[in-house]
Amino acid sequence: MDFGDDFAAKEDVDPAAEFLAREQSALGDLEAEITGGSASAPPAASTDEGLGELLGGTASEGDLLSAGGTGGLESSTGSFEVIGGESNEPVGISGPPPSREEPEKIRKWREEQKQRLEEKDIEEERKKEELRQQSKKELDDWLRQIGESISKTKLASRNAEKQAATLENGTIEPGTEWERIAKLCDFNPKVNKAGKDVSRMRSIYLHLKQNPIQVQKST
């Protein structure tokens, strides 16, 4: 009984070889479009050759692509062609952008600002010098006043000491006792808030100086 075992065996088709053939054909069409049809795509490799190279490993990947046509990606000299006007060559690094010239207004403003700062520094130094001179003058005046006050105090102390020595050693004339005592007193009406009020005592001394008490000698 015949079950159809003698039917013709169908040709085996390798999917990898068929895919490579389609890709090579597409690359050839792309090259034809780019070059304007001046060069036709090279014939695609047969399915058996592609299958043999893929399975046998007799050709490298570069040989397989060159045998089947690279579609314009690689020329006969081994260099890649430019596609779409774009180059793969490295672009040189450009230098720094040229410096723009500073506008006239900004340059003028900088010069005026610099001049103002210089004038301000000069004025500040002048004021400092005036303050130093004024402080020195005030200090000299204060020292001079202190020196004069000390000299007057010393002179008054020496005079008072001489008068006290004269009163102790000299003879006292009648009626001049209170006058001599009044000379030892300070009748300047200065009020010392921290001290005692001696205004009444001063008034008594002045009264006795002007109207001394007459001392009657006993017989």
Curated annotation (Swiss-Prot):
It comes from the Eukaryota. It is found in: Cytoplasmic vesicle membrane; Membrane, Coated pit. GO terms for cellular component: cell cortex; clathrin coat of coated pit; clathrin coat of trans-Golgi network vesicle; clathrin complex; clathrin vesicle coat; clathrin-coated vesicle; cytoplasm; mitotic spindle. Residues 32-136 are annotated as: Disordered. The gene is Clc. The keyword Calcium applies. It is a peripheral membrane protein. Keywords: Calcium, Coated pit, Cytoplasmic vesicle, Membrane. There is no evidence of the neuronal splice variant found in vertebrates. Clathrin coats are formed from molecules containing 3 heavy chains and 3 light chains. PROSITE patterns: CLATHRIN_LIGHT_CHN_2. This is Clathrin light chain. Residues 99-136 have a biased composition (Basic and acidic residues). It comes from Drosophila melanogaster (Fruit fly). Residues 96-158 are annotated as: Involved in binding clathrin heavy chain. Belongs to the clathrin light chain family. Clathrin is the major protein of the polyhedral coat of coated pits and vesicles. GO terms for biological process: clathrin-dependent endocytosis; intracellular protein transport.
